[in-house]
Each structure stands twice: as C-alpha cells, then as structure tokens.
C-alpha cells in the first residue's frame, strides 16, 4: 500500500461554472455522443450514462425506459441465461435496445459458465460488464485478458476501479470501458 499526501478533490470541491452560450434553450443541448472502442472496434451512439448492474437498478424494465432517452443499462448479473434469451427474443424488433445493454458477469467459474451459455443463446449481445468488488486484483485483470481473447468482438466494460493507472491497465488487458 502507498499513502498519498498530496491534496485530493471530492465532489463537494467541484463547481461547474456556466459560460456564455449560443443556445436559445436548454432543450437545444444534445447529449448524444459517439464512441468507437479501442479493443472491440464497435461504435456506441447514445448518452454516455449507465444504469448500474445492481439488483434494483440493472433491470429489464430499466433498460426499456432508458433506451427511450437513449441511455445504457448494465443488467444485474443474477439474471439467468434463459431469462435473458426470453427477454431478447421478445425485443428482437428493437435492435437499438441491444446496443444499449450489457450482460453482467463476475469472474468465478460459475459466472464464466453462465456468461458462456448466455452468449451462445443470444449471439447478438454486443456488451458484457465484468464486475467485481475489487478491480485491483491480478485475478480480475487476468480474467479480463482471457475474456478478450475468447470474445474479441464483445465490447467489455470492466470495474470497479478509481485510478487512471488501473483504468489504463484494464484497457491494455482488453477492456473497452474501465
């Protein structure tokens, strides 16, 4: 462990200062952005805000609502492959929905079996969120690298980390979003 003694800022230290604008109304502001990811080479177009993959947040209902904006949803990792397959099957007529959803997984063998099954059933899945409580473990970094090797076409969201150094390491190991 290393102790940093330099000053750190928190949200309470940040002031968003407005500046002059040519916009006639705040309704004219366009938050939609387009990103091409480094490793998967896929392009995302939407508002870059994600609903977390928590049980009460990363739900099918949340995904259906956020796509209207368009925002992104990381589904709760406890959804079973059959549930995801059924849900995707019922929404096949909404191709934009699939480009705004990530299927979530952990890094255990059981998690790997579940995500493998899900990706076999739902071949149109574009995003996977690899989520652990401590993104600073070598085991997590190694898992991201193995997942990238196995699924080069998937856009990988990986975390949780808070430092630029580990975000960079995740991207070098194969993640697209860290």
Question: What feature does the model see in each segment?
Answer:
Residues 1-177:
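Active-site entrance/lid segments in N-terminal catalytic domains of soluble metabolic enzymes
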């Amino acid at each position: 462990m290393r102790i940093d003694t330099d000053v750190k800022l928190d949200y309470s230290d940040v002031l968003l200062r407005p500046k002059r604008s040519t916009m006639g109304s705040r309704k004219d502001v366009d938050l939609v952005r387009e990103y091409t990811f480094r490793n998967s080479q896929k392009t995302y177009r939407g508002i870059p805000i994600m609903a977390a993959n928590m049980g009460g947040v990363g739900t099918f209902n949340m995904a259906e609502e956020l796509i209207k904006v368009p925002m992104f949803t990381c589904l709760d990792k406890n959804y079973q492959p059959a549930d995801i397959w059924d849900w995707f099957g019922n929404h096949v007529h909404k191709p934009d929905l699939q480009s705004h959803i990530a299927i979530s997984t952990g890094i255990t063998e059981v998690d790997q079996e579940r995500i493998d099954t899900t990706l076999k059933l739902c071949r149109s899945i574009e995003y996977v969120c690899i989520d652990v409580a401590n993104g600073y473990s070598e085991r997590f970094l190694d898992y991201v690298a193995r997942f990238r090797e196995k699924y080069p076409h998937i856009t990988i969201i990986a975390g949780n980390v808070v430092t630029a150094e580990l975000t960079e390491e995740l991207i070098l190991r194969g993640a697209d979003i860290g």
